[in-house]
Structure formats: C-alpha cells, structure tokens
Amino acid sequence: MFLRHVIVFSLIALLTGCAGLTSREAVQGKGDPAQWREHKQQLSSLDGWQINGKVGIRAPKDSGSGTLFWLQRQDYYDIRLSGPLGRGAARLTGRPGAVVLEVANQGRYEATSPESLLQDQLGWKLPVSHLVWWVRGLPAPDSKSNVTLDGDSRLASLEQDGWQVEYLSYVEQNGYWLPERVKLHGQDLDVTLVIKDWQPRKLGQ
C-alpha cells in the first residue's frame, strides 16, 4: 500500500521539461483574454522552481496524504515525499528519457518516462507530464483544452485530456501569481495539492 501511495504521489507532482507556449485552448469566463495571454507569457518563462507543500490522493480503494518537496531546474527534477504515507520516504529524480524512483525500505525503480513508470508499476494511465504546466496555472501545450478564467484573468478551471483541474486560490511571489490550492479530478482519482512555499526561477536567461 505504501509503495502504491509513493508512486502515485511522486508522479502526480512532475515534469518532463519546459517547451514553448502553443496550447490549443477554448477560453471562457470572467477574465480578459488579452490579460490572460500576457499572464501565460509571463508564466511560461519560468523554467525552474522550488515548491514545498502537501499532496493528497483519493481513489475508490486507496487514499492518503503526505508532504511534498519539488525542485525543478529546466528539464531536471528532484521530488521528495515524506509524512503520513507509511513507514518511509521517497525520492524521484530524472530528466527526459531517464526516471529513477527510490523508496525507503522498498527498492529502486527505473523507466524512460514518468508515464511508463506509472503504467509499469500500477497499470494506470495519467497525463503526468502535464503537471509541469498545470502547477504553474497553465494548460499543457500539446493537446486541446477548455479554459475558464476568473475575474483576475487567471485560470479558475481547466479541462484537458479527460481531467478537470480547479484552481481554488493563488499567491503572489516575486511578481508572479502562482497556484496555491489546486484540485485535480480524473476518472476514479482525485488529487489535492496545497503549496505552502513557492520559489520561482527563470534559469534560461
């Protein structure tokens, strides 16, 4: 049970590098589309961050929560999980083409992508590479999306690839408005992310 939690928590919180902003989206809601485009452009320039927070997951036969540390440096990531997940901790590191998951007292698992690691270990298919975009409050650029804007021209909700993402609150950090509380709803799976500390970076300059 602990290993199942660890793999899901690790892969729900990640990353396969940052690309250009070319999402195909339908926009509705209260916000101004022009301000939304400016907001997207600003956030898309972030290619590094450090996050501290909490993550929870609920499935028909499985649920749990834990603390999250996520370091992103362009296409490299280091994600660590601990807390009330079980009797250990986990660390997920890698870059495109090479992913390593280390679980205390459980073992070491390798794959070429976070999606394939999740598929191999649990038999689940999740668009985990979208999270590098969703965590910044952006739709992933490689598939169609339906976007609803709030009154500040930021994401209120997002529908993409069978997932519904709700943005419950934002926080301002270093001039960037970034998600603070996010809920993700998929088929038979709900994920809640609460970010306690955002440290955004622009590394590619």
From Swiss-Prot:
Belongs to the LolB family. Its main location: membrane. The keyword Protein transport applies. Monomer. The keyword Transmembrane helix does not apply. Residues 1-17 form the signal peptide. This is Outer-membrane lipoprotein LolB. Keywords: Cell outer membrane, Chaperone, Lipoprotein, Membrane, Palmitate, Protein transport, Signal, Transport. It comes from Pseudomonas syringae pv. syringae (strain B728a). InterPro entries: LolA/LolB/LppX, OM_lipoprot_LolB. A lipid is attached at C18 (S-diacylglycerol cysteine). It is a lipid-anchor. It is found in: Cell outer membrane. It holds the Pfam family LolB. Plays a critical role in the incorporation of lipoproteins in the outer membrane after they are released by the LolA protein. A lipid is attached at C18 (N-palmitoyl cysteine). One of its GO terms (cellular component) is cell outer membrane. GO terms for biological process: lipoprotein localization to outer membrane; protein transport.
